[in-house]
Amino acid sequence: MSMYPQELGAIPAETMRVARAAYPKGSLAMRLRDELAGIYRDEQFASLFPTRGQPAEAPWRLAIVLVLQYVEGLTDRQAAEAVQGRIDWKYALGLELTDPGIDASVLSEFRARIVAGGAEAQLLDTLLELCKQRGWLKAGGKQRTDSTHVLARVRSLSNLECVGETLRAVLMDLARLDANWLAQQIGPEWLTRYVHRVENYRLPKPESQRRALAEQIGADGLALLRALEQAATPAELQGVQSVQLLRQVWQQYFELREGQAHWRAGPQAEQEGVIRSPYDPQARCGKKRDTVWLGYKVHLTETCQTPPVEPAQGQEQRAAPRLIVQVETTLAEVQDVEVTATIQHELAQADLLPDEQVVDTGYLDAGLLVSSQSDYGIRLLGPVLADTSWQAAAGQGFDLAHFQVDWQKQQVICPQGQRSVSWSVQSQRIEAGFARHTCAACACRPDCTHATSAGRVVHLRPQAASEALQARRAEQQTPEFRQQYATRAGIEATHSQGVRRMGLRRSRYDGLPKTHLQHVLTAVAINLVRIDAWLLGKPPGATYQSPLALLAAHPLLYQPPPPLQEAC
């Protein structure tokens, strides 16, 4: 399909008249058109369409439909029906009341074009740029970042189910492409094993029988791969994506010995991680405390404690709406600390760097405390991990905080005034060792080291990181830090809004790119809901408290909170 850019155009008179009569107070979709008209334009999506072919639906309209779809938590079919029958949607899209709308498949095709063209971020960036022009958003200030888990659209499989379903998926694809060729490679017993979905309740229960079945599946898969490698095999079958996936899965779950596939005790993890489902090979197992899931992870960064907006004549001054400014989607196994620098880089690209970024411990390490400030001018606010040495855990003895470091002389001074005699630099770690005879003669040895054949060894980071880490460990014990860090809790409300209204924690699509597009659309939808509430003068809702919790403020039950203890 081809695309010829068109102007936004005016709302048809009859559509406007009926919509105003049906919605005297307006609706979010109508206010979107009135206040943010022209947010998307056809020219933005021109690169996603060829220059020849049948004319496509106006991309700006499809983008608005996708956003409204997420605002209301609709499926593709429901969104297409809303375009066809909802008066306020026709108003937002500038359509005649008699317009027949679109087919639901058009939305899927448009999403595929966005993903193929790498234009996911454009949907959010365009809205943020408009917010900058309106004075609702600017660089600086304070932002907060947090992540939450996202379940993949596939079921979680055991190892045996995974290999069985992987082979079954390949057979389904080959049967669809060239049934005659496949019929020559398999026997009737293959249909018995793979015609039905491989599920645990259909599998044998004794371990010996399950292992025998795994070996049989391995042999079948290996035989099929060898047949596909023959010169007479049609080239279109050899290049099927599921065939490449079969090779990866067999490398992970089987060991090739003497020309046969032998079942491993557990999957052999490769650099990109263990594949858990053939229907979404990018889905990974993640674990955070007691939560275990198969899928992805989404990181949201939003503004907080926003500055006031210059009011219009006759209006009161109000703080700007809180907006999501950056979205990052990763595999579930990626740790939060690995994406901190990426988030900051993208904020810099969008000219939206904050003065202060509030994060939890997962996004922090000593190096990032330094690089965030030096590279981007950001104060990374959050608690760092505590000292894990036995001295710190016991609450007695000499942990790292008790030692002084003379960086110029490359020596460490212990609490008793003794100096280290060795200084070894290994990558980003420094080891400073004390003489054995010095520690052996020290009366404080039991509080310092358990080593009997050597002196105390102190492990350090490079100077800037080490000093930043020790300063933060001291700072995070103060009441002022706790009060500043309390701001981070507000992003939990953003997660709740995304989960309850827009299904943030359940991927609608397969694969990381499409899941990321879902999260970008969710962020745009949340921003529009917040902008709409801000335009109507509705303040953010207070944190819900149950009737029983409210009794805590009753004069008969009120207890003042205990005072915070000052840091030592």
Write out the residue ranges for each language-model feature.
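Amphipathic alpha-helical interaction surfaces
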Residues: 68-74, 85, 89, 133
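Contiguous, well-ordered alpha-helical segments that form the cores/surfaces of helical PPI scaffolds
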Residues: 59-70, 85, 298-299, 342-345
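N-terminal intrinsically disordered, low-complexity, charged/polar
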Residues: 1-26
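Helix-terminus loop motifs that line ligand-binding clefts
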Residues: 89-101
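A short secondary-structure junction motif
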Residues: 39-43, 86, 90, 501
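Anion-binding and metal-coordination hotspots
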Residues: 78, 83, 97-100, 108-568
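Basic, short loop/linker segments at the boundary and entry of helix-turn-helix/winged-helix-like folds
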Residues: 22-67, 71, 460
